[in-house]
Amino acid sequence: MFCVQCEQTIRTPAGNGCSYAQGMCGKTAETSDLQDLLIAALQGLSAWAVKAREYGIINHDVDSFAPRAFFSTLTNVNFDSPRIVGYAREAIALREALKAQCLAVDANARVDNPMANLQLVSDDLGELQRQAAEFTPNKDKAAIGENILGLRLLCLYGLKGAAAYMEHAHVLGQYDNDIYAQYHKIMAWLGTWPADMNALLECSMEIGQMNFKVMSILDAGETGKYGHPTPTQVNVKATAGKCILISGHDLKDLYNLLEQTEGTGVNVYTHGEMLPAHGYPELRKFKHLVGNYGSGWQNQQVEFARFPGPIVMTSNCIIDPTVGAYDDRIWTRSIVGWPGVRHLDGEDFSAVIAQAQQMAGFPYSEIPHLITVGFGRQTLLGAADTLIDLVSREKLRHIFLLGGCDGARGERHYFTDFATSVPDDCLILTLACGKYRFNKLEFGDIEGLPRLVDAGQCNDAYSAIILAVTLAEKLGCGVNDLPLSLVLSWFEQKAIVILLTLLSLGVKNIVTGPTAPGFLTPDLLAVLNEKFGLRSITTVEEDMKQLLSA
């Protein structure tokens, strides 16, 4: 096992990365190794997808499957070894079908890629794990060095984050052939074990630029189906009655669940990154979408244990449900998996609803505590002139984009302290689950404009980018000249690709934490600092002083 993709990876003087019987996320060495094997199979599939496009062959089954299966290897998504192998088998079957299509056009069709003809050696998980050793990401570290390995992983993990957003968009009916062609090209190239530093750096920026387009179609999918988010108050306390909790990012799953629970007497609560769903008109119209439950994903083993109903996980993040003994009432959907947990293959939630009706639910309603969400792209752009006016009248000094992933590391209290230290004449724009560090606190307003503005999920960084570009255009300056600072927390691969997106768009002087990614060496961090001004957090006082004086 070698895995260094998330923020909680093991760090030692000898090197970074989880390489024992189990990773810090709870992923076993077996599952981790089989995910490496799956990635190799997907790289071979992409190699043939690139070749097929040369012949004008575009196989939509391949295009939809590839990023979805890649998404299953993202942190805290799928811990179920047999399902990972199932994805690998499906990848090979699709590859062979695509290969046959190519050969039907050109009998001499060939692909020069080491993954292009990969076959699984056995049905036995142990033998497959041994085969997977050929594809361990750091297998040639001694030959290429830590810097090249780090850049490879930056590209691989960034592309994995983009693949997750591609799947979220595809679920909502969004498909862009150019994006998929670019995805396959990059995925196939990474399967050749590239070792050119400049080419890898260029690739990382290409992934960021591609992901901006992915976020654009995801935004179109969400707003096209569910309307543009508008500011909405959400109760974060319990309402009496039977209940279901839904977590993850998949708004379509939430919509289907709301439709199927309507009139059943079962209330629905959002968790984690589902919180922004309350801002969408076509979702909040369901009166039994009663509120948001819990805090950051890392607290779920305590909070889920206390929730008196079933739980549905639609995407990341799931962690071991046996710890809180709620594994008999947590359900996985789509690419999510945990051994022994019931999985919903389709969009029928009747079994979950039946379980909710058999459980006690919340016995009484607590005193409501309301927070505000729903500052989507349209709302943010509508406020652009107000922001400019407040800045011109010196009522608004600075905007801090304070968001990203949450996690368990104690140093993450930095983000709570930072939020509460932001001066009263400054505004906080937040997104993603890092907001749970401070989103239930009171921040007041500036002439009626809330000082805490929740823009949505991690992918809604797109809205923040569009706002920044709009403000810069209206003020006749560059984005980096705005009174705007980005202080971002990271945990997994979606955060990595958001960072690459920002860097590829030329955004500079981003501050990140709580730690630097374990796969980035001091040399690589120095390069990123020199090129983009990217740096790690220090202390709240020092960072605040520096950002306000910039």
From Swiss-Prot:
Which InterPro entries does the record cross-reference, listed alphabetically?
HCP/CODH, Hydroxylam_reduct, Prismane-like_a/b-sand, Prismane-like_sf, Prismane_a-bundle
Q: Which residues bind [2Fe-2S] cluster?
A: C3, C6, C18, C25
User: Where does the protein end up?
Assistant: Cytoplasm
Gene3D superfamilies listed in its UniProt record: 1.20.1270.20, 3.40.50.2030
Q: How is the cofactor bound?
A: Binds 1 [2Fe-2S] cluster.
GO MF, one example: peroxidase activity
Leader sequence residues: none
The chain's disulfide connectivity reads: none
Q: Which residues bind hybrid [4Fe-2O-2S] cluster?
A: H249, E273, C317, C405, C433, C458, E492, K494
Q: Kindly report, in one word, the top-level EC class recorded for this enzyme.
A: oxidoreductase
EC number(s) recorded for this UniProt protein: 1.7.99.1
Q: Which GO terms describe its cellular component?
A: cytoplasm
Family of this protein: Belongs to the HCP family.
Provide the function of this protein. Answer: Catalyzes the reduction of hydroxylamine to form NH(3) and H(2)O.
Q: What's the protein called, per UniProt?
A: Hydroxylamine reductase
Species assigned in the record: Escherichia coli O139:H28 (strain E24377A / ETEC)
Its taxonomic path starts at: Bacteria, Pseudomonadati, Pseudomonadota, Gammaproteobacteria, Enterobacterales
